[in-house]
Amino acid sequence: MTVTNVAFNPWTWEFTLEGLTVAGKNNNPPLLSLDRFYVNASAQTLVELAPVIDEVTVDGLNAVVALDDEDMRRLMNGHGSAEGGSSEKASSESSSLPSFAVYNISVKNSSLQVLDRARAIDQSVTDFNLELPFVSTLANSKSSLVTPKLSMKLNGTPIFATGSTQPFGTTLSARLNMKISNLDLAPVFKLVPALNTPSLMLENGRLSTEVNVVFRNATSGKPGKMLVSGTVNVNDLTAVQQISNRVQPLASFKKASLQLTELDLLEHQASVGSIVIQDPKVHFVNTPSGLNVSQTAQGFSSGAAADSGKDSGSNSGWHWRVDSVQIRNGNATWNDSTVRPAAKINVTALNATVTGLTNAANAKPAKAEAGAKVFGGMLSLAADVTPAPLVVNATLKASGLQAAQLASYIRNATGFDASGAVSLNVKAAVKGSAVTGSGTASLTNLQVKQGKSTLVSARTASVKLGSLDTAKQSVNVDSILLDTAVVNAVMTSAGLNLMPSKAGAAKKAAQKDADAKTTEKAGKPWQWKVASADVKNSRFNFRDTSVKPNAAITVSDINASVKNLSSAEGAAATVKMSAGTAGGTLAADGTVTLSPMTADVSTTLSGINMKSLSSVMTAYAGIGAQSGTLESKGRFGLASEKDKQVASWAGDISMAKFNMLNAKGRSLMTWNNAALTGLAVKTTDPVTLCVKKAEIDQPGTRETKAIRELSGLASLLTGKDKYAKKTEKYLGGSIVLNGVRYENGRFSAEGIDGNAVATALLTKLSGAMSTKLQ
């Protein structure tokens, strides 16, 4: 380092430094050269107990900063670590600028070059000239005749600023107007490490500004001002990132503009007229290694965390207001390779406006509106927002959202394909951590498929949410409607087709465990109520190919309703249902409770064609029917017995023209009419079944022939012809059985020792049904 001249006048407090040179390494150009540095300090410094400088002149300052130089990196890193603690402490002690005053500032013929060969950085500021009348935070009436101006070239692009001044007394102020036109930002971006990482690289951008800076001296009891206002425009900004060794787009916009009404650096107040972003595009990419924007955010958050201690003190006192924020014609894409097939979702025509956003206390809420095309439909949002403390009241509306747009996620979770149109009209309020909501949701033209087979379809499924309150942990649903639904259930040896795939079931089980743990930690369970749930004009088709013969049944014209279903202890809900099956009708009416689980429901079957139910009867009871008509009335019950849920049914059954078949399809027994009075069944272990009275009118010829053969054989063996005659008198009339029971795999009845026909009937029933009822 060399210096040509150093001079200091103690009487006038003038300091002059001339010919300063700091040589570069290995015969490189000087790192720093300074032709002349002049400072004229004022005696007012002693009065104000703060620096007061009458004049500062810097002439011919030329610096070269080599970012890839080891000494420079050591200096920069050491500076950050050594002074970080003290600067943090200083910033926490005061959130305002220190007291000082500098007048008649002049910087001439200066330049700065920044180099980093490893990152191909070669940026320069040349022909730098700056003149300012003053920069002051002190109440001082000193005059200045300097007219503010600025000129320089940034990488060859001229930047000019001109100004005016009111130099005397209480009106001491200066204004500087700076204009930048179409400055290429790409070279400037290279100077910022956070903008040159694999997760974020800014490639293009053009900057245009017109900014006014006002310096107003603190005089006549009025505080000093440092005010900034103007407009900033950035055009054609493009950001990319590296994913799987490929450079892919991250974000871009056609134009972003900022209209700064006033920024008061001393009073920590900011007023923004408008922020407008035109044609923004954002590309979200989710891979097994993570979400691309999360990786980008981590780069910023690490730097922000390091500076948070320094900045928290200075930022805490800021008051701000933004009159308007707009996004026009935005687009976003979502690509997710974590599911198969890969998901791709597009958001287009995104337009959003926020007005009156501020952190001022007791301010009116900001108004927000947004709309976009997504999932093949339209989505809109209107909200009132108060930032601090956070309060949001919003209305979300959607129409024509296509479930098929989420096909990859639905298939990945369940193994099914789904389609349908979703509409929403939801109101929500957020106050701190509490959320309340209400609204409606509907799904039309629903279809759930597995391959080419349709599992579920519905014309309409809708929900009306009365209220949701996370603070109270309560949900009240006004109504649920399922209209014109068709369910096609098929049981195979692999399981029920309506169940999710193994992968989906595993995820569902894992989620259920996680939810259970969350509920356990939360302590208090959620309370919910459904005022009304209805199923209209629906059908249920069932086939079971896992049994021989295959079983099939169809329940059509299903109309059902549930009222006041609730999680409350002992709350009873009313249920009502009617449907058609096997050529007849069935109906149910009664009450159920969920806590504890109970049911008391009357049931009615009328005109049921037994032949239509033959496959189901054979598969699950071991007997079928060639013909017959079933009528039934009774009550279904569900209750807890010895800590086990037990289902029961009690009532009367009658059958006409009944021809019973065994599992092989052969006629087992026939009769014209049969009535079971006082039938009671319970799903205990083993199953309990009893009939108070069974009447069978006119047994068929197959039974009478079998009994004649049995009685004839008995008479030959015993030599008692009276036994055969006694048996014969039962064959032409009716059979009455009292106290029929099913125990230990066999049917029995009271007082049938002399009734061979009755004994034969029960024997055949036992043989045919025992394996199914065990």
Language-model features: where?
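Flexible, surface-exposed loop regions and adjacent strand-edge segments
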Residues: 70-78, 194, 248-249, 289-297, ...
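Flexible beta-edge/linker motif
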Residues: 5-71, 91-113, 144-146, 172, ...
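Hydrophobic residues in beta-strands and at strand termini
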Residues: 41, 132, 180, 215, ...
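Structural detector for hydrophobic anchor residues on beta-strands
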Residues: 159-161, 207, 228, 437, ...
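N-terminal amphipathic/hydrophobic interface segments
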Residues: 1-25, 166, 170, 179, ...
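Elongated, acidic membrane-bridging lipid-handling scaffolds
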Residues: 36, 83-195, 223, 304-405, ...
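Surface-exposed loop/turn segments flanking beta-strands in extracellular/periplasmic regions
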Residues: 76-85, 294-304, 499-510, 717-722
